[in-house]
């Protein structure tokens, strides 16, 4: 008997006989007509006894005096021997008294079929059985972290508001929207958090904000903005942090959480942004509570006082000395104290080295005391000069030396006329005409327009140009590609709106922009 486990190939053949025949007739014809045909090594009887050939299966049907069917011969021989055996079956031309014809149409590789079944089954096992029984290592880690976060989650007050374990002991707390936000921040080690559960702020949270430095950390959507508005009305918060637009705090990763908290802004900026009116007495309370917010309170009062008492007017001097400022005192203070106080002496360069140009619309200048600002000597001060516009004046003499409040004045230096470059005379009319049109003009040696084309077609057109081109003016960016094409055409002038990333320019080419003309 043939062991089906060792079968390598199955020979599929079909038989057509002119007459009625049965299975024993076909099997007998196969053994009888192939006996001694292939030699002793490939004799079917010997091969079947040794198990190299399996049981021959025959399936036939007789209809209308003719018989049709299929013959299956299992083989454990190699490919060559199996092919010889299959070819020998086609030599059978008679079965019993009837003429017959056998034709082999397939040799099936049993091992290939088994491999396909193995692959399909392996896919099923991998997708279903592993997911159901064996969790991933990341799932195990997430499960452990989740259990730890749930254990650390505590509750505050009679309403059992979810919060972090350090919300009572910490000097600063973070107000979040919901329980999921607290769990996400606990995951990254932030434990001084408490949630409000929506826009209805619990009274316990509002009372807690009066004792601590509070940061409101909300989602980057409309709901987060509404929570901030509610907190500004019923609670006392110091800073506001927002998640990125369209994201929730519970979905942020550690890097996004840290970045959002570092970018928190003082509550005063949020009040100005949303245009919210503070409750009566709340603004004074914010300044008086120095113990709660030690950073912001000292900065507010000096800034307001300085802004009200002094107006700074910068004096431009052609000198390497630090910038000087004129501090304009109020008129009432000037009248009462101008004669009593002596002004400090400030060393200034000689009058012949100092000149100042003042716009023609400058007005009267009030009594000033010129004071050097040593704290800003290492950097440039703002160049904004404030002058009253009561009466137009053509020029105001500049102060050059100060002694006890008196200034020595010199007339301003004359304005120098800058000569117009020849390129400006030649190409400026073309630049003005092409501004905003996205077109280009190709000029000859006499600066006459040879052709006017679109900027997008300029590079391809210059490649095919054979006429004598001297200059190209166009409303676009000068690129390295255009420079190379212009150089190959011996173009001397290339004028555009601005210069892009250019690594090299030929020595005989002039590259200009509209601002250079």
UniProtKB/Swiss-Prot annotation:
Protein's GO biological process: DNA replication, synthesis of primer
Residue numbers binding Mg(2+) 1: 177, 219
PANTHER family documented for this protein: DNA PRIMASE
GO terms, molecular function: DNA-directed RNA polymerase activity; metal ion binding; poly(A) binding
CDD domains for this protein: TOPRIM_primases (cd01029)
Keywords: DNA replication, DNA-directed RNA polymerase, Exosome, Magnesium, Metal-binding, Nucleotidyltransferase, Primosome, Transcription, Transferase
Ranges where the Toprim domain occurs: 171-257
Catalysed reaction equations from the record: ssDNA + n NTP = ssDNA/pppN(pN)n-1 hybrid + (n-1) diphosphate
Gene3D superfamilies in the cross-refs: 3.40.1360.10
CC cofactor note: Binds two Mg(2+) per subunit.
Family the UniProt entry places it in: Belongs to the archaeal DnaG primase family.
Residues holding Mg(2+) 2: 219, 221
Cofactor annotation: Mg(2+)
Entry function: RNA polymerase that catalyzes the synthesis of short RNA molecules used as primers for DNA polymerase during DNA replication. Also part of the exosome, which is a complex involved in RNA degradation. Acts as a poly(A)-binding protein that enhances the interaction between heteromeric, adenine-rich transcripts and the exosome.
Pfam families: Toprim_4 (PF13662)
GO terms for cellular component: cytoplasm; DNA-directed RNA polymerase complex; exosome (RNase complex); primosome complex
Disulfide bonds: none
Organism: Methanosarcina barkeri (strain Fusaro / DSM 804)
This enzyme's EC code(s): 2.7.7.101
Protein name: DNA primase DnaG
């Amino acid at each position: 008997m043939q062991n089906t486990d060792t079968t390598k190939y199955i020979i599929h053949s079909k038989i057509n006989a002119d007459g009625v025949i049965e299975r024993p007739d076909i099997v007998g014809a196969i053994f009888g007509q192939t006996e001694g045909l292939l030699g002793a090594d490939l004799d079917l009887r010997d091969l079947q006894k040794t198990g190299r050939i399996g049981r021959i299966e025959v399936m036939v049907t007789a209809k209308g005096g003719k018989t049709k069917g299929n013959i299956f011969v299992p083989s454990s021989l190699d490919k060559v021997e199996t092919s010889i055996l299959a070819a020998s079956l086609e030599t059978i031309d008679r079965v019993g008294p009837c003429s017959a014809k056998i034709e082999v149409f397939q040799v099936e590789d049993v091992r290939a079929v088994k491999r396909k079944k193995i692959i399909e089954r392996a896919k099923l096992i991998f997708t279903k059985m592993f997911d159901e029984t064996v969790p991933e290592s990341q799932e195990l880690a997430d499960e452990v972290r989740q259990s730890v976060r749930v254990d650390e989650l505590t509750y505050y007050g009679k309403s059992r508001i979810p919060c972090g374990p350090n919300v009572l002991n910490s000097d600063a707390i973070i107000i979040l929207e919901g329980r999921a936000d607290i769990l996400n921040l606990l995951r990254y080690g932030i434990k001084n958090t408490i949630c409000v559960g929506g826009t209805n702020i619990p009274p316990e949270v509002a009372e807690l904000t009066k004792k601590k430095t509070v940061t409101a950390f909300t989602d980057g959507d409309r709901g987060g903005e509404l929570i901030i508005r509610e907190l500004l009305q019923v609670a006392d918060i110091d800073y506001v942090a927002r998640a990125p637009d369209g994201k929730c705090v519970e979905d942020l990763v550690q890097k996004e959480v840290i970045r959002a908290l570092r970018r928190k802004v003082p509550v005063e900026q949020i009040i100005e942004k949303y245009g919210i009116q503070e409750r009566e007495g709340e603004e004074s309370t914010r300044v008086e509570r120095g113990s709660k917010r030690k950073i912001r309170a000292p900065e507010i009062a000096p800034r307001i006082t300085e802004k009200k008492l002094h107006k700074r007017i910068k004096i431009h001097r052609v000198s390497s000395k630090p910038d000087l400022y004129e501090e304009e005192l109020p008129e009432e203070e000037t009248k009462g104290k101008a004669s009593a106080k002596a002004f400090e002496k400030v060393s200034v360069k000689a009058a012949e080295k100092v000149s100042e140009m003042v716009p023609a619309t400058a007005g009267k200048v009030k009594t000033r005391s010129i004071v050097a600002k040593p704290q800003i000597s290492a950097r440039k001060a703002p160049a904004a000069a404030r002058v009253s516009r009561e009466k137009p004046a053509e020029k105001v003499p500049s102060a050059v030396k100060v002694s006890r409040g008196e200034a020595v004045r010199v007339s301003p230096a004359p304005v120098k006329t800058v000569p117009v470059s020849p390129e400006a005379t030649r190409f400026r009319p073309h630049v003005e005409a092409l501004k905003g049109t996205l077109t280009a003009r190709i000029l000859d040696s006499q600066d006459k327009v040879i052709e006017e084309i679109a900027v997008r077609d300029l590079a391809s057109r210059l490649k095919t140009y054979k006429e004598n081109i001297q200059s190209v003016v166009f409303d676009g960016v000068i690129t390295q590609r255009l420079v190379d094409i212009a150089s190959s055409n011996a173009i001397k002038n290339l004028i555009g709106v601005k210069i892009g990333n250019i690594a090299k320019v030929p020595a005989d080419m002039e590259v200009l922009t509209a601002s250079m003309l």
